[in-house]
Amino acid sequence: MNIQIFGKKKCFDTKKAERWFKERRIKYQYIDVPSKGLSPREYQSVKQKVGFEALVNTKCRAYEELHMAYITPDAQEEKLLEYPELFNTPIVRNGKEATVGYCPDVWAKWE
């Protein structure tokens, strides 16, 4: 398994995801979304699995400030890559598989 957790340091669900993998002694790589973001290829891979809507955090302040609800889908994608704080976290990848949020039932099937 090649687990990557894309998250935010203050995100409760990201901490729960890290703990879940630690308890099972599964090695993972943590990537801080606000500082590193997702590469365009990583983004496309995750979007293909979970869909665009699942990736966007509609409850964050940046969503309102950038008027995300009122712009075209293409412009939303550009903003999402430009402002990584818009991502829902944690984004957990295992090769080509991906989840958004705390999904231990799905991760257990990866083992």
Predicted regions and their residues:
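Local sequence-structure signature of Cys/Sec-based thiol-disulfide redox active-site neighborhoods
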Residues: M1-R24, Y28-V33
